[in-house]
Amino acid sequence: MPSIEEKIENIAKEQLKKCRTFTKTESINAEIDDALKNAPSKSGGKGSNYPDIKLFPATKSNRKIPVMIEVKGTKGALIKTAPNGEIDNSKPSDIQKYAVNGAVHYADAIVKNTMSYKESVAVGVNQGRDSYSLRFTWYSDPEQRSESHN
């Protein structure tokens, strides 16, 4: 069955219009742009990284937290986990195929490759023709500890 990724991405963007802080192609921050540009690509080689949607919201105390969102429009492409339940990004193909894995890849690039941001939120969105899934993952340090919330 073909992917409906673009349609799902547009639905997600429509929901985020209230935030007025999201983008796909524009810069949200030079340091984050450099981190995404210089990190290994989702395929494992060199090249830039392009999250489907980027947010840069501020907390009540005006602390900004980068949010990377990856959308997949093929049913069953939300997340790939290891037998222990952790997100499995050991294979580039899993980073490319699964929404959460791709979003975590981007969040990881920010946490590892910036001085200012040691936490990031990864969001995977997956919807097939008749089902919808969303997963948030909070990245908080370079040791790759994460906490997932359905």
Which residues does each PLM region occupy?
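A short, conserved, highly charged catalytic patch centered on acidic carboxylates
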Residues: 1-121, 125-142
